[in-house]
Amino acid sequence: HNDFKLDNIMWSNSNPFDPVAVFDWDMCTRGDPLMDLGHMLNYWIDETDDEDCKLITSMPVTTISYPRREEIIGYYAMKTGFNVDNINWYYAFGAFKLAVILQQIFYRYQKGQTQDRRFSNFGKRVNALINRANNIF
């Protein structure tokens, strides 16, 4: 999928843990499924993350009803049978990849090519992602 995160999933009305559709296929590529997990982990903020990391996303995952990153990794391994021993590589790569995407959007915002005020702090988000990627290992 290449952009797997909560706001790209539609959940069942009868069971909020049952995904019924995945949206936003414009960046879809073939590849290692662990790339989706690594990418998603960058949108998943734990309550113990520093404030810079919390800038990265607006996903509401710090509430008590959502699992922590480590729990997601374990659940993913259990459900897929995939080896997640090297997940930090995918997590770091996902952070760098997302930083590049946000930098492109921030550049366009600074040049006046887009007016959406949500992009005004993307420079800080880019720096937070680069710092995260550098500190994962």
Where are these regions (language model features)?
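All-alpha amphipathic helical-bundle segments outside canonical DNA-binding/catalytic cores
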Residues: 82-94
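Conserved NTP-binding catalytic cores of kinases and kinase-like/nucleotidyltransferase enzymes
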Residues: 10-21, 55, 80-85, 119
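Regulatory N- and C-terminal appendages and interdomain linkers associated
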Residues: 100, 104-137
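A generic short alpha-helical patch detector that favors 3-5-residue windows
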Residues: 29, 64-68, 125
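Active-site activation/catalytic loop segments of kinase-like enzymes and analogous catalytic loops
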Residues: 35-80, 94-111
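Short amphipathic alpha-helical segments and their helix-coil junctions
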Residues: 18, 22-26, 68-82, 128-131
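Active-site acidic catalytic loop and adjacent metal/ATP-binding pocket
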Residues: 1-35, 39-41
